[in-house]
């Protein structure tokens, strides 16, 4: 192996070793299945202590790039184009460790529902139930921060308010919520880096978006919020929201009707719905850590060190070729416009389906965390087959091309073209497609459900490849 350790570098020797082996694996100079030199041999070749090499190998093993065979032997398991790349940035697409804890808690009245639903503790009505939900825009606010710092345009944060609200609203849609919703926003900022005008833009954006939702029939109202100055916790800004509502138990979409024999209708995440003000890239609010680092250039790491986790390996930080103002390939948008595109809500479409076609919807899945594999959490002994997906939108193609991320992993991190799935009888699929079309949102039958003898699993067709997820 061609490894050279610079003893005069400010980068620790173990990190230099990690970065160089990482590069050799990514460029396939070290191939999957190839046995690595022993720790002792690497230490001798690099002039390092054995414990320094061992520390580097543990880091590579954590990233999923190598696997220990014995006390000192390792085998290459693949490039970080798989799950290792996302995990190495401190992010989990499926939040396995979180779900392992939540599984032990009370699941509420309807254990298979998309959101936790409780008895009506607010009003005490036995025929009603409460739904409370919390979510946010994730690290998308950091991209807005970069854009603001580069341009001085504070209005970019208005879209961030929409992202945070939609991530709550569209989860609530999946349990059939169409009543009155109160939403509260939480802003955690580094006040030295994020002045008051950013907070003002976020609040204004929230109020404007809530007002626009009411104009299209969504009964959502502002419940105020909280702004905290927590510079020790964040170098930039974090935007989250919490929604609460009351609904009748008989109207809940419980998830129990997601069974074999259904059509899966995907609602496109791209284009421009007639209730949107601009073209949507489809990016949503998931996978933005990877999108930001894989697309944007080292320029942002050097100029804005407060915008990334210093614990992440240097070669995974802002390692892309683009600046925010650069054109996105195969798109009319710039890179900045594409990754800041506000998350689309499907509320007007779902509301109309619920009101005009009662019983048509058997289940709804918001393809947020876990993306196209989110469906695996719902139903029992189901084989989800997705063999007619939308072509990957330009923003996701660009991310894959610059990062060399495996397509199988892309479908676990990004929505890849549709962010809402409607599960319905096959002969009702055209109704869903027509209703979506009336809002200028593309829809298509992306797949179906069949019986499975081995628990829930997903077969996803990408070009000539078939990706398998689940047991």
Where are these regions (language model features)?
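Conserved functional loop/turn residues at catalytic and ligand-binding sites
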Residues: 29, 64, 176
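Short, Lys/Arg-rich nucleic-acid/phosphate-binding segment
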Residues: 36, 68-80
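Extreme N-terminal segment that seeds HTH/winged-HTH DNA-binding domains in transcriptional regulators
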Residues: 1-36, 41, 83, 93
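Core alpha-helical elements of the protein kinase catalytic domain
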Residues: 22-23, 58, 170
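N-terminal helix-turn-helix
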Residues: 35-67
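Helix-biased detector of long, well-ordered alpha-helical tracts
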Residues: 84-471
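Conserved catalytic core of two-component sensor histidine kinases
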Residues: 18, 54, 166
């Amino acid at each position: 192996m061609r490894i050279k350790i610079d003893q005069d570098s400010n980068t620790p020797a173990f990190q230099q070793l990690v970065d160089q082996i990482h590069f050799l694996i990514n460029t396939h100079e070290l191939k999957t299945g190839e046995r690595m030199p022993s720790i002792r041999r690497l230490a001798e070749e690099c002039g390092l202590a054995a414990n320094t090499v061992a520390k580097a190998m543990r880091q590579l093993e954590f990233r999923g790039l190598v696997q220990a065979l014995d006390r000192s032997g390792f085998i290459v398991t693949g490039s970080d184009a798989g799950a290792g790349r996302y995990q190495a940035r401190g992010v989990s697409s499926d939040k396995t460790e979180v779900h392992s804890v939540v599984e032990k808690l009370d699941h509420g009245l309807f254990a298979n529902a998309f959101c936790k639903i409780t008895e009506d503790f607010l009003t005490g009505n036995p025929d009603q139930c409460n739904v409370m939900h919390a979510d946010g825009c994730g690290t998308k606010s950091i991209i807005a921060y970069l854009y603001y710092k580069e341009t001085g345009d504070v209005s970019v944060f208005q879209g961030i308010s929409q992202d945070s609200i939609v991530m709550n609203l569209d989860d609530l849609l999946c349990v059939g919520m169409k009543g009155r919703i109160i939403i509260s926003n939480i802003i955690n900022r580094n006040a030295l880096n994020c002045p008051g005008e950013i907070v003002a833009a976020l609040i204004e954006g929230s109020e404007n978006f809530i007002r626009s939702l009411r104009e299209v029939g969504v009964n959502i109202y502002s419940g105020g919020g909280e702004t905290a100055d927590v510079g020790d916790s964040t170098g930039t800004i974090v935007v989250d929201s919490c929604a609460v509502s009351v609904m009748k138990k008989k109207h809940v979409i419980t998830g129990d009707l997601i069974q074999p024999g259904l059509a899966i209708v995907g609602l496109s995440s791209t284009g421009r719905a007639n209730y949107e003000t601009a073209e949507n890239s489809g990016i949503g609010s998931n996978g933005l850590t990877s999108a930001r680092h894989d697309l944007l250039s080292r320029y942002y790491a050097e100029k804005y060190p407060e915008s990334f986790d210093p614990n992440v390996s240097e070669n995974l930080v802002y390692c892309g070729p683009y600046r925010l103002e650069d054109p996105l390939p195969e798109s009319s948008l710039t890179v900045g416009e594409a990754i800041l595109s506000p998350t689309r809500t499907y509320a007007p479409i779902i509301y109309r389906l619920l009101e005009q076609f009662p019983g048509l919807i058997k289940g709804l899945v918001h393809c947020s965390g876990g993306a196209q594999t989110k469906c695996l959490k719902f139903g029992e002994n189901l084989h989800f087959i997705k063999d007619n997906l939308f072509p990957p939108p330009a923003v996701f193609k660009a991310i894959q091309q610059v990062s060399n991320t495996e397509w199988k992993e892309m479908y676990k991190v990004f929505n890849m073209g549709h962010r809402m799935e409607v599960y319905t009888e096959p002969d009702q699929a055209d109704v869903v497609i027509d209703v979506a079309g009336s809002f200028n949102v593309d829809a298509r039958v992306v797949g179906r459900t069949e019986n499975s003898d081995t628990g829930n699993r997903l077969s996803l067709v990408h070009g000539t490849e078939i990706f398998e997820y689940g047991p």
